A protein has these predicted regions:
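Thiamine diphosphate
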Residues: 136-188
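Structured alpha-helical segments in the cores of large, soluble enzyme domains
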Residues: 12-21, 110-111, 150-160
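Conserved catalytic cores of soluble enzyme domains
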Residues: 1-56, 162, 170-188
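Intrinsically disordered, low-complexity segments enriched in small/flexible residues
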Residues: 34-144, 151
Length: 188
């Protein structure tokens, strides 16, 4: 956070939630939220292990016996929740989603294809719950928050020469006064 939680207007002492993990995750200021220190370290190590050591490195390749051209019969039933679809197409169903609690209609993260790390950006129209049923539905429009989330991730991937895969099914742009304030900037 930038300001101390007790210095923010309307953030009264009993609340002071602007420094909390939930607030920061929903704001897009953190990539991953963990339950405890051990999980946080494991996720940090997982993320660091897939990234090139610097912007001039060629990237990280891993051994892969998963057939890139395999048939994925269940893929068609997961196209509305693209986080599930990305996991389906990735080597060994591995997907590291980032900023999962921010702009949930847009999915970003890393997958592996034929052993290579690939950035993935996709919009979703449904968020599936653990029971496999739609827990939340989204319009198939680009929002300002989703566009910023995607743009920052693509910029990050570009700075490390990580290729990006996109899965899109968009019918237009979100239209409201709030969206109009910044959507053009977010999309540029």
């Amino acid at each position: 956070f930038v300001n101390s939680p007790n210095a923010v207007d309307n953030n009264y002492t009993a609340k002071c939630n602007t420094a909390g993990a939930v607030f920061q995750a929903e704001s897009g200021n953190v990539d991953i939220v963990a339950e405890d220190d051990a999980e946080a370290l494991a996720k940090a190590r997982e993320l660091v292990s897939i990234l090139p050591s610097n912007n001039e490195d060629t990237g990280v390749l891993s051994e892969c016996e998963d057939d890139l051209n395999r048939v994925t019969a269940s893929l068609g039933s997961h196209l509305k929740d693209t986080a599930v679809a990305l996991r389906e197409i990735s080597d060994n169903n591995w997907f590291l989603e980032l900023k999962a609690d921010c702009a949930k209609e847009m999915v970003i993260g890393f997958i592996r294809l034929n052993g290579a790390v690939v950035g993935a950006v996709a919009n979703r129209s449904e968020l599936l719950g653990e029971d496999g049923k739609a827990a939340k539905k989204f319009d198939t429009v680009l929002t300002m928050a989703g566009a910023y989330k995607a743009a920052h991730f693509v910029e990050f991937c570009d700075s490390f020469s990580i290729p990006v895969l996109t899965l899109t099914s968009v019918t237009g742009f979100a239209s409201s006064v709030g969206e109009e304030r910044s959507i053009a900037r977010a999309l540029s």
